[in-house]
């Protein structure tokens, strides 16, 4: 990981604290309150407090420390992580049918993230501002408007990038975790009995004591590990070691101290269940805590927003989402991007969620299904990658996946009970994203197959043109070609209608590799097909944005000199119609594809080609 080489371990570890652990680090704001709020038929009872604390502690140890930090983070693609990366790794050495299944699982996991990302900013910021209920009860009616104002400002600054503000994230989050630890330790010293809950026997006793209702209570316990996927998804930004060091040295101790501190407070003062997090603080510290909590939740929300930008770019580059405008907000960091359409769709969705649910406790019912669903899929995909790619023994992989699923499946099942009380929200959003991604991928493949099914051989056509050339005009023409040995539609139509050809013709194919980055040395491959025809294949990773000017520069280094303002770019523009023979459900999918195609970013804008150098030739295609 290059970042680790450029910066010292303490510096990059501090940066990881500021970004990776925002979501899981703000969970103490609401987790224990939701566990003991009385919704499961029992209130602040000693056995319940000890049971929940034991469950939270061992979930943090098993799921975060053991599963993700020890095992899942081994699965990286050139240092990058995330559910789509894991999907790609798992499908490398499998059959075509198995690969299709793994792709579906990966897309479901990615869709779950889109469902979760709408809830995270809403519940985080609202739970922080709800500290006003303790500090200034008269301001309670303003919690929803204030939450919207804070998030509006956050979404508005996205287009400017977070480079300057981002430098403050790490020290603020470090201060947040230190305050969590101090407040928790202070409360534990007043009631050290609570440390008994470190014994897993209390977790077992909880299930025996509360029987059936204890299973439903797992749906609240899982709030303590929301954001765990960020550890894996952000691996490419910081590297494995800094993320692990940050967890074991700062984050885990702070979280455990704070949860147990809240438990100690509740054992002595059960009425503190109204908001045990803020009631840990002395009266004089309530306003500073409210400000710090709001800043921490804004940072957690920023991490989620950046995550959805990164996932969207990856999905676009892998062909699962339609092309859209991606703006780089930093000349130094390629990972800092802004996608306007995603930003504002997410903003409006978050505002609607805040207005509809009104309180973070109501949102807690919607939280968890997407998180635990992704955990289940991660276990399956990781086990497949371990067996197929690294050839781990069947016994080891079997024991590992059984251990993971013995935790993941009960957590997911418990959260399914929330389906009608809010859980439908992330599932619905995830379903919409899954339909969009599968529609774009499958219909785009169908379109390309229809366009090329009657195509003649490119080599044969070039040979024919060299033997009997049409009228040649001065200059260079570039034709975008999706497949190597297929004649571009724009070239066919130009010959058919204009009956001319430029003196030099370049067939340009853009290829997305199964890697986040492609080294500049391997960026461009040139092949001279004839005295006047050249084939250029430009390779990019899924974290990179293709740029024609850069491609021309690499071509010049290879001996093919091109000047942007002296080159004509010919592109085909498909006018799509839906075939009458398609079943009704495929016709619906076709209409969705037409809508996506109509709103997709045009090729000249994707590749930063000057509009006055582009010639589009239309063709009608039935899909």
Swiss-Prot record:
Which reaction(s) does the protein catalyse, per the Swiss-Prot or TrEMBL entry? K(+)(in) + H(+)(in) = K(+)(out) + H(+)(out)
Please verify whether the record's keywords include Transmembrane helix.
Answer: yes
Please indicate if the UniProt record lists Secreted as a keyword: no
| Primary location class | membrane
Where is the protein situated, by its record's location annotation? Answer: Cell inner membrane
Which GO CC terms are listed, alphabetically?
A: plasma membrane
Look up the signal peptide feature and give its range.
Answer: none
**InterPro entries the UniProt entry points to:** K+_transporter, K_trans_C, K_trans_N, Kup
Molecular function GO terms recorded:
potassium ion transmembrane transporter activity; symporter activity
Residues spanning the membrane:
9-29, 49-69, 101-121, 137-157, 163-183, 212-232, 247-267, 276-296, 337-357, 363-383, 395-415, 419-439
Question: Which UniProt keywords are present, listed alphabetically?
Answer: Cell inner membrane, Cell membrane, Ion transport, Membrane, Potassium, Potassium transport, Symport, Transmembrane, Transmembrane helix, Transport
For membrane topology, the record states: Multi-pass membrane protein
* Function text: Responsible for the low-affinity transport of potassium into the cell. Likely operates as a K(+):H(+) symporter.
Q: What is the similarity comment for this entry?
A: Belongs to the HAK/KUP transporter (TC 2.A.72) family.
**Name by which UniProt lists this protein:** Low affinity potassium transport system protein Kup
Species of the source: Cronobacter sakazakii (strain ATCC BAA-894)
- The gene coding this protein: kup
């Amino acid at each position: 990981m290059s970042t680790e080489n450029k910066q010292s371990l303490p510096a990059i570890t501090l940066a990881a604290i500021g970004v990776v652990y925002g979501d899981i680090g703000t969970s103490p704001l609401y987790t224990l309150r939701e566990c003991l709020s009385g919704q499961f038929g029992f209130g602040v009872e000693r056995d319940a407090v000890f049971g929940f604390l034991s469950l939270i502690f061992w979930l943090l140890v098993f799921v975060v420390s053991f599963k993700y930090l020890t095992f899942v983070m081994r699965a990286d693609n050139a240092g990058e992580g995330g559910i789509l990366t894991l999907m790609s790794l798992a499908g490398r050495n499998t059959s075509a049918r198995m690969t299709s299944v793994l792709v579906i699982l990966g897309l479901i996991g990615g869709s779950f993230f889109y469902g979760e990302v709408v809830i995270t900013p809403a519940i985080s910021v609202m739970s922080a501002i709800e500290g006003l209920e303790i500090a200034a009860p008269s301001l309670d009616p303003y919690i929803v408007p204030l939450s919207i104002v804070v998030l509006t400002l956050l979404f508005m600054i996205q287009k400017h990038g977070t480079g300057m503000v981002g430098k403050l994230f790490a020290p603020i989050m470090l201060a947040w975790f230190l305050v969590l630890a101090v407040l928790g330790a202070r409360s534990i010293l007043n009631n050290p009995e609570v440390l008994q809950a470190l014994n897993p026997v209390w977790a077992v006793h909880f299930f025996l004591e509360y029987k059936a209702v204890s299973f439903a209570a797992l749906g609240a316990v899982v709030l303590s590990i929301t954001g765990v996927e960020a550890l894996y998804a952000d691996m490419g930004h910081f590297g494995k070691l800094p993320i692990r060091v940050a967890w074991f040295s700062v984050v885990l101790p702070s979280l455990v101290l704070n949860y147990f501190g809240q438990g100690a407070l509740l054992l002595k003062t059960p009425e503190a269940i109204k908001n045990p997090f803020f009631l840990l603080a002395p009266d004089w510290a309530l306003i500073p805590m409210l400000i710090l909590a709001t800043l921490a939740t804004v940072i957690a929300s920023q991490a989620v927003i950046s995550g959805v930008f990164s996932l969207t770019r990856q999905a676009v580059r892998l062909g699962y989402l339609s092309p859209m405008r991606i703006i780089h907000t930093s000349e130094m960091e390629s990972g800092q991007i802004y996608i306007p359409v995603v930003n504002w769709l997410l903003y409006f969705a978050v505002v609607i969620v805040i207005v509809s649910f009104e309180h973070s406790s109501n949102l807690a019912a919607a939280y968890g299904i997407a998180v635990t669903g992704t955990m289940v899929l991660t276990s399956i995909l990781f086990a497949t990658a371990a067996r197929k790619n690294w050839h781990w023994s069947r016994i080891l992989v079997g024991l590992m996946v059984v251990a993971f699923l013995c935790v993941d499946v009960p957590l997911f099942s418990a959260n399914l009970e929330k389906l009608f009380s809010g859980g439908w929200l992330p599932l619905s959003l995830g379903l919409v994203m899954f339909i969009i991604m599968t529609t774009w991928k499958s219909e785009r493949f169908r379109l390309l197959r229809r366009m090329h099914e009657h195509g003649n051989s490119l080599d044969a056509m070039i040979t024919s043109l060299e033997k009997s050339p049409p009228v040649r005009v001065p200059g260079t023409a570039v034709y975008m070609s999706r497949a190597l040995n297929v004649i571009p539609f724009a070239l066919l139509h130009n010959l058919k209608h204009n009956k001319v050809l430029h003196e030099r013709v370049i067939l340009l194919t853009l290829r997305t590799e199964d890697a986040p980055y492609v080294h500049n040395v391997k960026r461009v491959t040139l092949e001279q097909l004839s005295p006047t025809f050249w084939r250029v294949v430009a390779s990019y990773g899924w974290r990179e944005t293709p740029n024609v000017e850069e491609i021309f520069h690499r071509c010049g280094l290879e001996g093919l000199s091109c000047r942007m303002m002296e080159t004509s770019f010919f592109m085909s523009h498909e006018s799509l119609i839906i075939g009458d023979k398609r079943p009704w459900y495929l016709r619906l999918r076709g209409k969705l594809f037409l809508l996506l195609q109509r709103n997709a970013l045009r090729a000249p804008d994707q590749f930063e080609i000057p509009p006055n150098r582009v010639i589009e030739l239309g063709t009608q295609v039935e899909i």
